[in-house]
From Swiss-Prot:
Belongs to the IMPDH/GMPR family. GuaC type 2 subfamily. Gene3D superfamilies: Aldolase class I (3.20.20.70). It comes from the Bacteria. It comes from Helicobacter pylori (strain G27). The keyword Membrane does not apply. Its EC number is 1.7.1.7. The keyword NADP applies. GO terms for cellular component: cytosol; GMP reductase complex. This is GMP reductase. GO terms for biological process: purine nucleotide metabolic process.
Length: 325
């Protein structure tokens, strides 16, 4: 198996067939819904919040609400249903999450999407949660993760998952690779390719995205959707503390397995960093959209499918994608 990561790969252009990049269509379908772009902000507390979720849903973007305010999830689904926007939430695998699924079913609330969100998704607990959701909420599109092997993808698909999320520890505020020695950090793009070849259902690439060009690379190597954390951190709308240093504003960004999320220093596999304030989230989404349209034009097509067919070269080798503790 070839081992490489995002900065090791360059995609090779094809003849352009559009008169303007603006003709290129970045639409993607996941489940029963179409979305403006194949991107989703990470379901982390400093990346997604209720107001951002509402903005994304209203404007045709995919989102996954984080699971760190458990009691707010049923009212959240109810509100999104009332507004006729897509409802997309996260769950863990603890027993109280089973009660949430049962209560949603009891109230006749079927979320459009539920993401089972744990660090090591190739586990019996995730398989049991998939089956529990499919029993009580059979119409819900279930995303399961996170995983890093073809065996895991196949097993979760066979258990009933409608999509799998690939990536163990490649994120900017994740230190799983350093703390445990395991994961896809440093070879996330190769892991995505490996898993996508085995998949029969959509793959969501999660982690290691440092540039907008990495979105196109993820599509090329098999992702239907790309989950992004650090590029969506630090915006005006983002949750988290703001600080000013030497006249420059910064916002905090921390991992879901960090002590800042957990509230205690136990089984820590995440860290906190400060991101320079980026302004409006809307402006970042516009820039991402334009850059992805450019990627499609370089691929020689009119839609995302063109990117999947381009050739590529491996230009160098890397290990940790620039990350340290």
């Amino acid at each position: 198996m070839k081992v490489f990561d995002y900065e090791d790969v360059q995609l090779i252009p094809n003849k352009c067939i559009v008169n303007s990049r603006s003709e290129c269509d970045t639409t993607v379908i996941l489940g029963k819904h179409a979305f403006k772009m194949p991107i989703v902000p990470a379901n982390m507390q400093t990346i997604i919040n209720r107001s951002i979720a509402e903005f994304l849903a209203e404007n045709g973007y995919f989102y996954i609400m984080h699971r760190f305010n458990g009691s707010a999830r049923i009212p959240f689904v109810k509100k999104m249903k009332e507004r006729q926007w897509i409802s997309s939430i996260s769950v863990g695998v603890k027993k109280e999450e089973y009660l949430l699924i049962e209560e949603l079913a009891k109230q006749g609330l079927t979320p459009d999407y539920i993401t089972i969100d744990i660090a090591h998704g190739h586990s019996n607990s995730v398989i049991e949660m998939i089956q529990r959701i499919k029993t009580h909420l059979p119409e819900t599109f279930v995303i399961a993760g996170n995983v890093g092997t073809p065996e895991a993808v196949r097993e979760l698909e066979n258990a009933g998952a409608d999509a799998t999320k690939v990536g163990i520890g490649p994120g900017k505020v994740c230190i799983t690779k350093i703390k445990t020695g395991f994961g896809t950090g440093g070879w996330q793009l190769a892991a995505l390719r490996w898993c996508a070849k085995a998949a029969r259902k959509p793959i969501i690439a999660d982690g290691g995205i440092r540039t907008h060009g990495d979105i196109a690379k993820s599509i090329r190597f098999g992702a239907t959707m790309v989950m992004i954390g650090s590029l969506f951190a630090g915006h005006e709308e983002s949750s988290g503390e703001t600080k000013i240093e030497n006249g420059i504003a910064y916002k905090e960004y921390f991992g879901s397995a960090s002590e800042f999320q957990k509230g205690e220093k136990k089984n820590v596999e995440g860290k906190k960093i400060w991101i320079q304030h980026k302004g409006s989230l809307k402006d970042t989404l516009i820039e991402m959209h334009q850059d992805l349209q450019s990627s499609i034009s370089y691929a020689g097509g009119r839609d995302l499918e063109a990117i999947r067919k381009v050739d590529y070269v491996i230009v160098k080798n890397s290990i940790f994608n620039g990350d340290t503790i």
